Structures are given as structure tokens and as C-alpha cells.
Amino acid sequence: MTNSPIASKAVPCRRIGTGPLHHFFGYYNKSNWDASGRYLLANQVPMMDADLTPDLVAEVGFFDLHDSDSYFSLGQTTAWNWQMGCQLQWLDGMPGHQFIYNVRTANKASFYPGFGSCIYNVDTKQVRQLPLPIYVAAPNSRYALCVDYRRLYITHETIGYGEHGPPRAMPHAPGDDGIHYMDLASGESHLLLSYRSLREFHPRVSMDRAIHWVSHIEINPASSRILFLHRWTERVKDETCFLHRLITVNPDGTDMRLLECSDHPLPQLADDFDPSAVGTFDYEKSEYQISHPLWMDDSHIIVWGPHNGEIHYHLYEDSEGGEVRVIGRDVLTENGHMTFSPTNKRWLLSDTYPDAATSQRILFLFDMESGLRHDLGSFYTDPDLRKENRCDLHPRWSRDGNQACIDSVHELQRQMYVLDVSHIVGTGGRTAVASNTRIFDKF
């Protein structure tokens, strides 16, 4: 393997959808293609950018890739944000074509009053409402994990849902809230892990006066193991003050393991520190950041974060004291949204945050066997977009491993694009592309 091998590859890229409306999916952690490859989930909104309010509506639906990429709106939601959308995801373990997403409800008796989720059956057009908003559904579609998005709105506004009026006061580490387990067939739920139990698990002094929350909850392919980031801070308005731990646990709450902790001194807590001086992406590029963990398989986790004094893409074995391996030491040198191909773990799809000078972001594939990085394109983003309304690429794989889908604003609209990477990954069966396909290196 040579040092810093990077190749540029021109790949077919086409925009999905036409007209004046805007489309996006949100996060990188799940495919928005259905199992057949025909339907591509997306939210539709009338604007590229807006401050989110509890009344702002997003359409919920999909593009039919077998019907001239026509968009079909199948519902609406006001429980969404620009980063994660409404947590749209296919339920592959259920019969037919079914997907789930978050909504606001009139149910004031639920554990999180006013919030829930819906399952939409594409084949029967039936909608079934569930009492909790989900963060992620298990691959077997038997259960989902749920959190309070009102807490996230206070601790990490970018991924939360707001309410009318001022934010409510939140206890720092309550014993009656945390990660909830919800059965997707019955809607029954119970508390899986409380914030108090997380604070008491290998406690740190920095936790004592901090507010706690969880994010990046992910379930392994076998639906038998859960990972999440436990975060805490005394200054929610300054993300560089966030502290992080990577933890795994069984779906019944047993066998909790601490894989990494980036607790560190925080000079930002000084009274004279100015959080407004922190750049939009300084937090994402922090040397202490643990972010974007995802299962490679049932027992290994890829993540950007520090280990033994160095920050890299790291591959963790899911065991305390297990092997931790640096991935792409001289090639993958900054934070990104990474996922492995669903058909060949040789291929890692990821991106970068915008370059401070050019506002360009790189989309790339990394070859785990050769160590070669294939840059697929460079996409401009408006530097005036803030943390809460930015548009990360958030690349997602198609089910056959031949294509990637991204969100982007490089054409001054928030839209989705599909890139054909089949000639790089060597899976064959190149997908025919529409007339608006462009071969590109930079936008």
C-alpha cells in the first residue's frame, strides 16, 4: 500500500426529481431505496432553507424510479429537522412495502406528549400510528428505539424537534427517561436505559453538573446488539464542550460495554469564552469528537474518533478491551458520514465536511483492501447555511451496492442525487441513467 493514494473518478450523477419543490432524505445511516430498488424515500418541502417551527410541514413519500422518477406524497409530518428528516426508513422485516416515520400527534397521554410515529403500508395504503417517536428501527422490524426529541432540541438542536413557547426545563440525568424500546407490532414500550444509569456507568467527574443525552443509536444487522453515543455537557450552546462515549448494549439492556470515552479538559467553560467565535464545522473537526458510528457487521463498528491519543476512522471490535484498528491512516484524515456496502464490505462510502476556503465537500469511496480512495465528486455548499439548516451529503447505498444517493444544495436547491459507482466497485449490471445524467468531478 502506498502513502495517501487518492484517485479521482468521473461517475454518472443525476438529480432525482424536477420542478420548483425541494427534496431530501436526511441521515446517512440507512438506505432510502426499498428492497426491490424501485422506490426511493424522500421528504418534499417548498423551500431550501427555513428556521424550523412546530408547524412547518414536510411531505412524506417516495420517488418511483420505474415511473420517470415521479414523486408520490403519501403523508405529512411536522416532526422533522434538516439533518435527519423525520427518520424515514423502510421496514424490511414486514410483509410488502412498509415504512415508518415520525409525526406530531394529539395524544397528550403518551410518554412524550404530542409526538409519535406512523407506519405506512404502500400496498394497502393503510396507516398505523404508534405512541412514541422512533430514532431507529431494528433490521428485523420487530422493535424500534425511541428518545425524547424535545431533550435533543435543548442539548443538540440540530437533531431535535421544537415546541411552541420557550424550551422546557429538563432534568440533567433522570431515572425515568432515556432510551425506550418499542414493539412495532403492538406499540408497547418500556425504558431500556435511563440517563441516570448512563451517568452511573463508569462515571466521570465532568458528568456531575452536566445534562446528558444519547444520539447515533444504531442496531446491528442481526438486530441483537445496539450502539449509541452517550453525550453530556455543561454548555449546550457550544458543541465544542460536548463530551462523548461510545457504548454498546443488548436489546434487553444487559451486557453494556464502554468502547471509547473522549472525556477531556474544557477551557471553553471559562466565563470569558465566546461560543459565537466557534465556526459552523469546528465541532465536527474537533480532535476529541466521537461521531457517526455504524455497524460494519454484527460485531464491528466503524467510527470517527480518538483512540490512544490519535483521531482517525477506527474499526472497533464490540468488546471491552477488544481490537481497535485504524482505517485509512493517511487517506481518511477528517470526519465524515461512513457506511459499508451492503453487498461487499471491501467498500466504504463517505464524505467530508466543507473546506473552509472553498465550501466544497468531497464524496468518495475507500477500498479497504487496497487502501485507495476514489473521489467521486466535489459539491459546493452555501457557507451562509447554519448548523441547524445545513445540508450534509449524507451518502447512502442502494441495496445492490451499485449506487449512492446524496442530499446536496450545489444547484442552489436542496435536492437528491444518485451516483452510479458500479464501474468502481465491480459489481456489474450498470444501471441505465436518465437524460439529465452528467459526468462530473466538481459542482
Model-found features: residue ranges?
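Short, conserved, GDST-rich strand-edge loop motifs in beta-rich repeat architectures
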Residues: N43-V57, Y101-Y112, V147-D176, F228-H244, ...
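Blade-loop segments of beta-propeller domains
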Residues: H22-K30, M47, T53-A106, I134
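Blade-level signature of beta-propeller repeat domains, shared across WD40, Kelch, NHL, RCC1
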Residues: N389-F443
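Blade-terminus and WD-like Trp-Asp/Gly-His loop motifs, strongest in beta-propeller folds
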Residues: K30-L41, W80-T105, Y135-Y143, V147-D148, ...
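Loop/turn-rich, solvent-exposed surfaces of beta-rich toroidal or solenoidal domains
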Residues: Q289-S291, M296-H312, G328-H374
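Surface-exposed loop and turn segments in beta-propeller and other repeat-based domains
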Residues: R14-H23, S73-W82, S189-A210, E260-S286, ...
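Asp-box/WD-like beta-propeller blade repeats and closely related beta-sheet repeat scaffolds
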Residues: A79-G93, I100-G178, L191-R209
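Beta-propeller blade signature
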Residues: V57-D67, G114-D123, A173-S186, F242-T254, ...
